[in-house]
């Protein structure tokens, strides 16, 4: 069977890949940005390690969300735990479109959350007692990643295969 006969599956797999790769890249960038700030703080005051580590981990959730949508997509098209579905190109494109929100928002919000977490790490460096307040700033960015996760999950699961 030629790949041209399986374009629906190709589009669906591309959707899963977009969700995982873009959201994962956003998390990697964000965690890296926050990690650079955290390293400087821990060098000066090792007692702040736990607090800045929590801040550094916050941008990592976008990658988890993308992976979740990727798994749901692979399960939906039958590549996990069953035979592969026979997808027409239109259905494959619908699945690809359903995966875009978490991929795109995960990439952008992961980086933005890393920048916000780095600023919050600066707050913790100067005033460790303000940890709770500082954590709210990167958590606000998280809201939009959660909204994108929700719409991608709802859209992928609503598509009839």
PLM feature spans:
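Hydrophobic, small-residue-rich transmembrane alpha-helices and their short perimembrane loops
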Residues: 1-161
């Amino acid at each position: 069977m030629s790949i041209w006969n399986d374009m629906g599956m190709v589009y669906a797999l591309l959707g899963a890949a977009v969700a995982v790769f873009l959201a994962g890249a956003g998390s990697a960038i964000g965690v890296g940005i926050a990690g650079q700030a955290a390293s400087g703080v821990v060098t000066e005051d090792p007692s702040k390690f736990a607090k800045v580590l929590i801040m550094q981990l916050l941008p990592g959730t976008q990658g988890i969300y993308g992976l979740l949508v990727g798994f749901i997509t692979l399960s939906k098209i039958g590549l996990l735990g069953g035979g592969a579905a026979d997808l027409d190109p239109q259905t494959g494109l619908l699945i690809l479109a359903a995966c875009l929100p978490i991929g795109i928002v995960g990439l952008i919000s992961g980086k933005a959350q890393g920048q916000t977490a780095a600023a919050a790490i600066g707050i913790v460096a100067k005033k460790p007692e303000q940890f709770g307040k500082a954590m709210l700033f990167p958590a606000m960015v998280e809201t939009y990643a959660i909204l994108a996760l929700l719409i991608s999950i709802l859209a992928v699961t609503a598509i009839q295969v």
